[in-house]
Amino acid sequence: MQGTFRDFLKPRTVDIQEQGERRAKIVLEPLERGFGHTLGNALRRVLLSSMPGSAVVQAEIEGVEHEYSSMEGVQEDVVDILLNLKSLAVRMHDRDEAELTVSVQGPGPVTAGDIQTAHDVEVKNPELLICTLTKAVAFNAKLMVARGRGYEAATQRDGDEDRVIGRLQLDASYSPVKRVAYTVESARVEQRTNLDKLVLDVETNGVLEPEEAVRFAAGLLRDQLSVFVDLEGGEFEAEQEEQEPDVDPILLRPIDELELTVRSANCLKAESIHYVGDLVQRTEVELLKTPNLGKKSLTEIKETLASHGLSLGMRLENWPPAGLGEDRVVG
């Protein structure tokens, strides 16, 4: 085989251009010709269809038996209220479902900011309008929020025979990504002018930052494609054995660069965990045995790793890489 994948250009520049509070453009260059569309289309599909998140899956509204009921003193129809609830942006920490309540006395608007939540549940768009009370009436509701991935129709969760009158089932769009578009522009490196520049335009609901969403999607693609790298046979395998295995650069980053709280960082260093690669190989059980590191710190660590497409309990075949030990601090 003439040449290897190392002959291909590898992107050197990643530029994040903020377009608003929840929207950003991520620019990647230079890419070999054609790779802009190859990577852009793959990332777009993953961002739109496979991102995990939370959504309202069920609502119980006082005085309402079904979505076609009428409510005295409420400007919106029940169908419109349910549509508004589907746009609720919720982030849950270390749990798979939660029950939220809302109780408002009219007249006036009912917004997502009126929802009462537990300490480990956040509403990221408190300005969202749920309904408008035109009279001095009360609006009381219970909302069930669940964690999932992609899109799930209400009919996929329960059959008609299992439904209780008054419990309104909602189709759930769990993805925190609202919109993704990409363009491929021309790039140049020295005398080469036939290269690609990929521009991803990503908008989220605020639960994840756009760059976090792209990082997660890229990590998911990498994980899915890694099985092909292990295929046996041919010169490819021989060449891989001749050279030292590549290590994901993020694993080489010191713990301090994760921007954890001082308490969490010090607890990890006390256990000789100085690099991200050291951390991801530990399990939750192992970390909870660390002195002064509680569940709150563990949750912070898990969320920080997830934002980088990583998790606890990972297996690293080539860790630590050669040369890293020279800089490691003995705790």
Curated annotation (Swiss-Prot):
A molecular function (GO) term: DNA-directed RNA polymerase activity
Name the Enzyme Commission number(s) assigned to this protein.
2.7.7.6
Protein name per Swiss-Prot or TrEMBL: DNA-directed RNA polymerase subunit alpha
Which InterPro entries does the record match to this protein? DNA-dir_RNA_pol_insert, DNA-dir_RNA_pol_RpoA/D/Rpb3, DNA-dir_RpoA, RBP11-like, RNAP_asu_C, RNApol_insert_sf
Identify the stretch(es) annotated as Alpha C-terminal domain (alpha-CTD): 247-331
The UniProt entry's sequence similarity note says: Belongs to the RNA polymerase alpha chain family.
What exactly does this protein do? DNA-dependent RNA polymerase catalyzes the transcription of DNA into RNA using the four ribonucleoside triphosphates as substrates.
Entries under SMART domains matching the protein: RPOLD
- Note down the stretches annotated as region Alpha N-terminal domain (alpha-NTD): 1-232
Please tell me whether the keyword Nucleotidyltransferase is annotated for this protein: yes
Q: Which CDD domains match?
A: RNAP_alpha_NTD (cd06928)
**Catalytic activity, reaction form:** RNA(n) + a ribonucleoside 5'-triphosphate = RNA(n+1) + diphosphate
Give the enzyme's main class according to its UniProt record, as a single word: transferase
